[in-house]
């Protein structure tokens, strides 16, 4: 279709030139036209030039179709769909293998104190926001920001790491920069070397376009991401500078936590199971409080007895203040209502915790005191 339109254009232009030549030709005494040798030569040259241009156009189009692997019999739509078929992104099933989790579950476990940001929308992550982790490079994004990129590209938008899974090859669980944090700079792995080569690559293309439909409700710090991403790949920066700048976009976790995130995501493959990460524990016997959820208006306290067993009871933070007991497998309740373990040791002492307002208005002298209630009477231990 394109070739025929070009041939018709050349033919029309040639006929126009022929009319000009005929109009400029000489007439003899009998009224007949006579062509001079110069006019004949001009006509032959013009016909030859246009014929050569047509042949070259057809040849170049055939070569282009062969280079792109297109079939000439596929219809006119093939010429328009060349750009769409040359840039495929990641499959949806591959994108789902990248773990997603709330930021609050890893905020206290991450290595480093620098604020963590999304490189696309340039917003700091909040506790209730969901993160998507790229296992190959440990960069984190909002799912609405990175999913649009991954559907059209196969690399990380920051470090250009290849995210296409290789059959038979497991996903790398090496955390970049972990050796530097722990002081083991002498231990170098091929994964770290490959990542450094990617970071110092001359390919400095930035994110061209991102669909913002998933994060339109979040305020943006800038209408464009080019200026902030450009400083990561500035030619004047040293080889170690890009990696330093990427720290605020990199989630560094302990190795076992990182492996648990990646393996749980690969295992569920579309299931909506909740990920349970280990909590920090203290080896010192004593008391510890924690939240049971703001919607329940409870927080729990934990007590370690002399035998090292854990005693956990929730405490209401709304009047009337009371405690509820959570019976462990090692505890039973006798007929009088007192707690006993299976060995017969009494656990009748219930901890009474003052409200935060009482702690605020009491002096420092009583700040560290704890009281115990037994059958409604307070007696210190």
UniProtKB/Swiss-Prot annotation:
Pathway per the UniProt entry: Protein modification; protein ubiquitination
Catalytic activity: S-ubiquitinyl-[E2 ubiquitin-conjugating enzyme]-L-cysteine + [acceptor protein]-L-lysine = [E2 ubiquitin-conjugating enzyme]-L-cysteine + N(6)-ubiquitinyl-[acceptor protein]-L-lysine
Domain of life: Eukaryota
ZnF (RING-type) residues: 118-160
Pfam families in UniProt: zf-RING_2 (PF13639)
Cystine crosslinks: none
Membrane topology: Single-pass membrane protein
Subcellular location per the Swiss-Prot or TrEMBL entry: Membrane
Gene Ontology CC: membrane
InterPro entries per record: RING-H2_zinc_finger, Znf_RING, Znf_RING/FYVE/PHD
TM stretches of this protein: 40-60
Keywords on record: Membrane, Metal-binding, Signal, Transferase, Transmembrane, Transmembrane helix, Ubl conjugation pathway, Zinc, Zinc-finger
Signal peptide per UniProt: 1-23
Keyword presence, Signal: yes
GO biological process: protein ubiquitination; response to L-ascorbic acid; response to light stimulus
Entry's EC annotation: 2.3.2.27
Domain notes: The RING-type zinc finger domain mediates binding to an E2 ubiquitin-conjugating enzyme.
Family the UniProt entry places it in: Belongs to the RING-type zinc finger family. ATL subfamily.
Protein name as it appears in the record: E3 ubiquitin-protein ligase ATL15
Organism annotation: Arabidopsis thaliana
